[in-house]
Protein backbone atom coordinates (compact mmCIF):
# COMPACT_ATOMS: atom_id res chain seq x y z
CA UNK A 1 0.00 0.00 0.00
CA UNK A 2 1.39 3.39 -0.95
CA UNK A 3 1.82 6.17 1.57
CA UNK A 4 -0.45 9.18 1.79
CA UNK A 5 1.28 12.07 -0.03
CA UNK A 6 3.06 14.26 2.52
CA UNK A 7 3.12 18.04 2.22
CA UNK A 8 6.55 19.60 1.68
CA UNK A 9 5.39 22.38 4.03
CA UNK A 10 5.42 20.12 7.08
CA UNK A 11 7.59 20.71 10.10
CA UNK A 12 10.63 18.47 9.87
CA UNK A 13 12.29 16.39 12.56
CA UNK A 14 15.48 18.53 12.46
CA UNK A 15 13.30 21.62 12.94
CA UNK A 16 11.64 20.08 16.00
CA UNK A 17 14.97 19.03 17.47
CA UNK A 18 16.37 22.54 16.92
CA UNK A 19 13.63 23.96 19.14
CA UNK A 20 15.45 22.69 22.24
CA UNK A 21 15.56 25.52 24.76
CA UNK A 22 13.72 27.90 22.43
CA UNK A 23 10.02 28.62 21.88
CA UNK A 24 7.86 25.79 23.29
CA UNK A 25 6.76 23.03 20.93
CA UNK A 26 2.97 22.77 20.60
CA UNK A 27 1.49 19.30 20.15
CA UNK A 28 -1.92 17.64 20.38
CA UNK A 29 -3.31 14.25 19.52
CA UNK A 30 -5.58 13.64 16.55
CA UNK A 31 -7.03 10.37 15.32
CA UNK A 32 -8.97 11.42 12.21
CA UNK A 33 -8.80 13.72 9.21
CA UNK A 34 -11.57 15.83 10.76
CA UNK A 35 -9.77 16.55 14.02
CA UNK A 36 -6.42 16.90 12.26
CA UNK A 37 -7.82 19.77 10.18
CA UNK A 38 -8.63 21.70 13.35
CA UNK A 39 -5.28 20.99 15.01
CA UNK A 40 -2.94 21.35 12.04
CA UNK A 41 -2.76 25.17 11.77
CA UNK A 42 -1.65 25.51 15.39
CA UNK A 43 0.47 22.44 16.18
CA UNK A 44 4.14 21.83 15.52
CA UNK A 45 3.42 18.12 15.55
CA UNK A 46 0.33 15.93 15.77
CA UNK A 47 0.57 12.75 17.80
CA UNK A 48 -1.47 9.79 16.61
CA UNK A 49 -1.33 8.22 20.02
CA UNK A 50 -2.31 4.71 20.98
CA UNK A 51 -4.63 6.51 23.39
CA UNK A 52 -7.03 6.19 20.45
CA UNK A 53 -7.74 2.69 21.74
CA UNK A 54 -9.42 4.31 24.75
CA UNK A 55 -10.71 7.56 23.24
CA UNK A 56 -12.01 6.26 19.91
CA UNK A 57 -12.56 2.56 20.53
CA UNK A 58 -13.73 2.51 24.13
CA UNK A 59 -11.03 0.20 25.46
CA UNK A 60 -9.94 0.28 29.10
CA UNK A 61 -6.23 0.75 28.29
CA UNK A 62 -3.98 1.50 25.33
CA UNK A 63 -2.77 -2.09 25.17
CA UNK A 64 -5.52 -3.10 22.73
CA UNK A 65 -4.29 -0.81 19.96
CA UNK A 66 -3.04 -2.81 16.97
CA UNK A 67 -0.52 -1.97 14.28
CA UNK A 68 -3.21 -1.94 11.60
CA UNK A 69 -5.32 0.36 13.78
CA UNK A 70 -2.46 2.83 14.19
CA UNK A 71 -1.74 2.82 10.47
CA UNK A 72 -5.40 3.38 9.55
CA UNK A 73 -5.77 6.34 11.90
CA UNK A 74 -2.36 7.65 10.85
CA UNK A 75 -3.42 7.67 7.20
CA UNK A 76 -6.53 9.62 8.13
CA UNK A 77 -4.55 12.23 10.07
CA UNK A 78 -2.09 12.61 7.21
CA UNK A 79 -4.97 13.33 4.83
CA UNK A 80 -6.31 15.99 7.17
CA UNK A 81 -3.05 17.84 7.83
CA UNK A 82 -0.50 19.79 5.84
CA UNK A 83 1.74 21.78 8.18
CA UNK A 84 2.34 19.78 11.34
CA UNK A 85 4.77 16.90 11.57
CA UNK A 86 2.92 13.66 12.36
CA UNK A 87 4.27 11.20 14.93
CA UNK A 88 2.59 7.79 15.28
CA UNK A 89 2.78 5.53 18.32
CA UNK A 90 4.10 2.04 17.82
CA UNK A 91 1.54 -0.08 19.68
CA UNK A 92 2.21 -2.53 22.47
CA UNK A 93 3.80 -5.73 21.16
CA UNK A 94 5.08 -4.24 17.91
CA UNK A 95 8.66 -3.44 18.94
CA UNK A 96 9.60 -5.35 22.09
CA UNK A 97 10.56 -8.77 20.69
CA UNK A 98 13.60 -7.70 18.69
CA UNK A 99 15.13 -4.70 16.93
CA UNK A 100 14.47 -6.43 13.62
CA UNK A 101 10.74 -6.80 14.31
CA UNK A 102 10.60 -3.21 15.51
CA UNK A 103 12.24 -2.06 12.28
CA UNK A 104 9.84 -4.08 10.13
CA UNK A 105 6.81 -2.60 11.90
CA UNK A 106 8.22 0.94 11.96
CA UNK A 107 8.83 0.76 8.22
CA UNK A 108 5.21 -0.30 7.73
CA UNK A 109 4.03 2.75 9.67
CA UNK A 110 6.31 5.16 7.82
CA UNK A 111 5.76 3.73 4.34
CA UNK A 112 1.99 3.22 4.60
CA UNK A 113 1.22 6.59 6.18
CA UNK A 114 4.00 8.95 5.13
CA UNK A 115 4.32 10.16 8.72
CA UNK A 116 7.35 11.96 10.12
CA UNK A 117 8.37 9.65 12.98
CA UNK A 118 7.33 6.89 15.36
CA UNK A 119 7.13 6.94 19.16
CA UNK A 120 8.19 4.15 21.54
CA UNK A 121 7.32 3.80 25.23
CA UNK A 122 9.58 2.24 27.81
CA UNK A 123 12.95 2.65 29.42
CA UNK A 124 16.65 2.00 28.98
CA UNK A 125 16.04 -1.58 27.89
CA UNK A 126 14.70 -0.14 24.61
CA UNK A 127 17.83 1.87 23.84
CA UNK A 128 19.23 -0.87 21.54
CA UNK A 129 15.93 -0.88 19.62
CA UNK A 130 16.00 2.90 19.22
CA UNK A 131 19.64 2.78 18.11
CA UNK A 132 18.80 0.06 15.56
CA UNK A 133 15.92 2.10 14.14
CA UNK A 134 17.68 5.46 14.01
CA UNK A 135 20.76 3.92 12.39
CA UNK A 136 18.46 2.79 9.58
CA UNK A 137 16.74 6.10 9.02
CA UNK A 138 13.70 5.78 11.29
CA UNK A 139 13.16 8.93 13.38
CA UNK A 140 12.19 7.98 16.93
CA UNK A 141 10.55 9.91 19.75
CA UNK A 142 10.87 8.28 23.16
CA UNK A 143 8.27 8.17 25.94
CA UNK A 144 9.25 7.69 29.58
CA UNK A 145 7.84 8.17 33.06
CA UNK A 146 4.21 7.11 33.23
CA UNK A 147 4.08 4.79 30.24
CA UNK A 148 0.47 3.64 29.64
CA UNK A 149 1.55 0.51 27.76
CA UNK A 150 3.13 -0.65 31.03
CA UNK A 151 0.07 0.13 33.14
CA UNK A 152 -0.18 -3.48 34.33
CA UNK A 153 3.42 -3.40 35.56
CA UNK A 154 3.05 0.04 37.12
CA UNK A 155 -0.11 -1.02 38.94
CA UNK A 156 -2.25 1.67 37.33
CA UNK A 157 -1.91 5.20 36.01
CA UNK A 158 0.38 6.41 38.80
CA UNK A 159 2.57 9.50 38.84
CA UNK A 160 6.25 8.57 38.64
CA UNK A 161 9.28 10.14 40.31
CA UNK A 162 8.29 10.28 43.96
CA UNK A 163 11.04 7.91 45.11
CA UNK A 164 14.76 8.32 44.54
CA UNK A 165 14.79 4.95 42.78
CA UNK A 166 12.16 6.10 40.29
CA UNK A 167 13.95 9.39 39.76
CA UNK A 168 17.27 7.71 39.04
CA UNK A 169 15.64 5.26 36.63
CA UNK A 170 13.75 7.89 34.66
CA UNK A 171 16.81 10.15 34.42
CA UNK A 172 18.84 7.22 33.09
CA UNK A 173 16.05 6.35 30.65
CA UNK A 174 16.23 9.87 29.22
CA UNK A 175 20.02 9.80 28.89
CA UNK A 176 19.97 6.38 27.23
CA UNK A 177 17.23 7.38 24.79
CA UNK A 178 19.22 10.46 23.82
CA UNK A 179 22.41 8.42 23.36
CA UNK A 180 20.51 5.91 21.21
CA UNK A 181 19.48 8.64 18.78
CA UNK A 182 15.96 9.65 19.80
CA UNK A 183 15.23 13.18 18.57
CA UNK A 184 12.88 13.98 21.46
CA UNK A 185 11.38 12.39 24.55
CA UNK A 186 7.91 12.63 26.08
CA UNK A 187 7.84 12.95 29.87
CA UNK A 188 4.45 11.79 31.12
CA UNK A 189 3.13 11.89 34.65
CA UNK A 190 6.38 12.73 36.43
CA UNK A 191 7.06 15.11 39.30
CA UNK A 192 7.84 18.68 38.28
CA UNK A 193 11.40 18.90 39.68
CA UNK A 194 12.32 15.67 37.90
CA UNK A 195 10.97 16.94 34.57
CA UNK A 196 12.91 20.16 35.02
CA UNK A 197 16.14 18.32 35.83
CA UNK A 198 15.82 16.01 32.82
CA UNK A 199 15.06 18.96 30.53
CA UNK A 200 18.21 20.70 31.75
CA UNK A 201 20.41 17.65 31.32
CA UNK A 202 19.62 16.31 27.87
CA UNK A 203 20.22 17.99 24.53
CA UNK A 204 16.98 16.85 22.88
CA UNK A 205 13.55 18.45 23.42
CA UNK A 206 11.35 17.19 26.24
CA UNK A 207 7.61 17.12 25.61
CA UNK A 208 5.59 17.29 28.79
CA UNK A 209 2.21 15.78 29.58
CA UNK A 210 1.62 16.06 33.29
CA UNK A 211 5.25 17.05 33.83
CA UNK A 212 6.35 20.71 33.88
CA UNK A 213 5.86 23.99 32.04
CA UNK A 214 9.67 24.02 31.93
CA UNK A 215 9.66 21.23 29.33
CA UNK A 216 10.54 22.16 25.76
CA UNK A 217 6.96 21.52 24.65
CA UNK A 218 3.58 20.20 25.71
CA UNK A 219 1.13 17.61 24.39
CA UNK A 220 -2.42 16.79 25.46
CA UNK A 221 -5.15 14.47 24.27
CA UNK A 222 -7.38 16.69 22.14
CA UNK A 223 -10.65 15.34 23.51
CA UNK A 224 -9.46 15.98 27.07
CA UNK A 225 -8.57 19.63 26.53
CA UNK A 226 -11.80 20.21 24.58
CA UNK A 227 -13.85 19.00 27.52
CA UNK A 228 -15.49 15.96 25.97
CA UNK A 229 -15.24 14.08 29.26
CA UNK A 230 -16.27 15.10 32.77
CA UNK A 231 -13.35 13.30 34.41
CA UNK A 232 -9.85 14.06 33.19
CA UNK A 233 -6.40 13.77 34.78
CA UNK A 234 -5.28 16.62 37.03
CA UNK A 235 -2.69 17.73 34.49
CA UNK A 236 -5.37 18.51 31.90
CA UNK A 237 -6.75 22.01 31.49
CA UNK A 238 -10.10 22.16 29.72
CA UNK A 239 -9.91 24.94 27.14
CA UNK A 240 -13.55 24.29 26.14
CA UNK A 241 -16.54 22.26 27.31
CA UNK A 242 -17.66 20.70 24.05
CA UNK A 243 -19.12 17.67 25.78
CA UNK A 244 -21.85 19.87 27.24
CA UNK A 245 -22.38 21.59 23.88
CA UNK A 246 -22.76 18.24 22.11
CA UNK A 247 -25.23 16.95 24.68
CA UNK A 248 -27.37 20.06 24.28
CA UNK A 249 -27.23 19.91 20.48
CA UNK A 250 -28.24 16.24 20.41
CA UNK A 251 -31.02 16.89 22.92
CA UNK A 252 -32.32 19.82 20.85
CA UNK A 253 -32.20 17.65 17.71
CA UNK A 254 -34.12 14.85 19.39
CA UNK A 255 -36.77 17.32 20.55
CA UNK A 256 -37.07 18.87 17.09
CA UNK A 257 -37.53 15.48 15.46
CA UNK A 258 -40.05 14.40 18.09
CA UNK A 259 -42.23 17.49 17.69
CA UNK A 260 -41.81 17.53 13.90
CA UNK A 261 -40.23 21.00 13.85
CA UNK A 262 -37.33 19.42 11.97
CA UNK A 263 -36.98 19.17 9.06
CA UNK A 264 -38.42 22.65 8.51
CA UNK A 265 -39.22 24.35 5.22
CA UNK A 266 -35.61 25.45 4.80
CA UNK A 267 -34.45 21.83 5.06
CA UNK A 268 -36.64 20.18 2.41
CA UNK A 269 -36.91 20.24 -1.38
CA UNK A 270 -40.02 21.28 -3.32
CA UNK A 271 -40.65 20.27 -6.93
CA UNK A 272 -39.45 22.84 -9.44
CA UNK A 273 -42.35 24.62 -11.09
Curated annotation (Swiss-Prot):
Pathways involved: Cofactor biosynthesis; (R)-pantothenate biosynthesis; (R)-pantoate from 3-methyl-2-oxobutanoate: step 1/2
Reaction equation(s) it catalyzes: 3-methyl-2-oxobutanoate + (6R)-5,10-methylene-5,6,7,8-tetrahydrofolate + H2O = 2-dehydropantoate + (6S)-5,6,7,8-tetrahydrofolate
Cofactor(s) the record lists: Mg(2+)
Residues at the catalytic site: 188 (proton acceptor)
Alphabetized InterPro entries for the sequence: Pantoate_hydroxy_MeTrfase, Pyrv/PenolPyrv_kinase-like_dom, Pyrv_kinase-like_dom_sf
Domain of life: Bacteria
Any one biological process term the GO annotation gives: pantothenate biosynthetic process
Enzyme nomenclature, EC number: 2.1.2.11
Compartment(s) where it occurs, according to its Swiss-Prot or TrEMBL record: Cytoplasm
Any single Gene Ontology cellular-component annotation: cytoplasm
Function, in words: Catalyzes the reversible reaction in which hydroxymethyl group from 5,10-methylenetetrahydrofolate is transferred onto alpha-ketoisovalerate to form ketopantoate.
NCBIfam families named among the record's database cross-references: panB, PRK00311.1
Family: Belongs to the PanB family.
Assembly and interaction partners: Homodecamer; pentamer of dimers.
UniProt-recorded name of the protein: 3-methyl-2-oxobutanoate hydroxymethyltransferase 2
